[in-house]
UniProtKB/Swiss-Prot annotation:
GO biological process, one term: protoporphyrinogen IX biosynthetic process
Catalysed reaction equations from the record: (S)-4-amino-5-oxopentanoate = 5-aminolevulinate
Protein name (Swiss-Prot/TrEMBL): Glutamate-1-semialdehyde 2,1-aminomutase
Cellular component, GO, one term: cytoplasm
InterPro entries attached to this UniProt entry: 4pyrrol_synth_GluAld_NH2Trfase (IPR004639), Aminotrans_3 (IPR005814), Aminotrans_3_PPA_site (IPR049704), PyrdxlP-dep_Trfase (IPR015424), PyrdxlP-dep_Trfase_major (IPR015421), PyrdxlP-dep_Trfase_small (IPR015422)
Family according to the record: Belongs to the class-III pyridoxal-phosphate-dependent aminotransferase family. HemL subfamily.
Keyword Coiled coil carried by entry: no
Enzyme Commission number(s) of this protein: 5.4.3.8
GO function terms (MF aspect): glutamate-1-semialdehyde 2,1-aminomutase activity; pyridoxal phosphate binding; transaminase activity
Taxonomic path: Archaea, Methanobacteriati, Thermoplasmatota, Thermoplasmata, Thermoplasmatales
Transmembrane segments annotated in the record for this chain: none
Organism of derivation: Thermoplasma volcanium (strain ATCC 51530 / DSM 4299 / JCM 9571 / NBRC 15438 / GSS1)
Amino acid sequence: MSSKELFELAAKLFPMGVNSPVRYFKDYPFYVKEGKGSTILDVDGNKYIDYCLGYGPLILGHSDPDVTRAVIEQAEKGLLFGEPSENEIKLAEMIKETSKNIEMMRFTNSGTEATMHAIRLARAITGRKLIVKMEGGFHGAHDYSLIKSGSGTLTFGSPSSPGIPDEVAQTVIVGKYNDENNIKEIFQKYGDKIAAVITEPIMGNAGVILPKQGFLEFLRDITQKHGSLLIFDEVITGYRFAFSPFQDIMRIDPDITTMGKIIGGGLPIGLFGGSEEIMKNISPSGNVYEAGTFSGNPMSMAAGYAAMEKLSKQDYSILKKRTQKLVSGIDDILDRKHITHTIKYYGTMFQVFFADHVNNYDDALKARKEVYFKLFKALSKNGVYLPPSQYETNFVSFAHSDSDIDATLAAFEKAVAEMD
């Protein structure tokens, strides 16, 4: 069946035919048949160099043979036991050894679960109710994350989705990423009531928005001053740029860290962790409840350990050089066409904005989304797949070769010409 035919069937089964909103785009999404290395093949026979990579987990590329082998071997032993297995210890030990601020952790099934439980834990430890999150920051699809700014910069947030009670929104204050004065004012007004600040160290769900020099250090200082906790959401950034969390590269010590994506090797996973003192509050050693039927399940643990074991032997500098080559090439193409743009990138992740600067969420909102979507459609026709949304992130994997980068730049040349 073709993608169009499959979508017509899917539209009768799922809202708008998809199981996650970002997968839908006009006129209909293509349906993937298989992925190998840096590429995906759709049911219509079209092959794409993939920079979406499952929205981030596949840093080793599609169908990595070592990860695939580990999954098959585990499947033959059992899919789920409801009891502990050795691989969860092996994966946790590897994460603990390479993460300065994680002495103890709890595996979950997604980044959404991880941040939800991290927020509950912070509230329990501090005895406080309020959470500060950043405008445009995404921490999963739970009620405490889906909050946007209220009518004023120092007011409580408002629900960004129907179904979230106003009472929930009244426990979340939305701050401005990269705006120290705004965060200072929030703490001056609510400081002794704030349980935690949660932020992505690099905002990856608003495109790619980098922290200004000193901003993350400022968050660490002001939370410590007021007895609040600092939560770094490293679901995207963890093990993305080196075999460590991003916080270790920046030498910043949050109280609680959440991770996901890469550490699962392509299978569902999440994690929240911190010092032993903090994590001992989680049940059954403490009274902060957290549980999950599939948490630490043997399939995800096997895939995660195999992926992390292989990743520990990789040279990240090669990956960064390829990303830089790609970004520089795209920048040159758009410059020669006199198209106003900026490319935000760090290490192995990047996004193209059609605006002259993007330093915060407000800037990202002003970028010309319609031009980005034209680029997305034109690139798809030329065999390159970027996320369809301006506010997602592109990733380069260890499976991407120099020839992939060259082919991508050639496709960009054609795509930009077709956009005229």
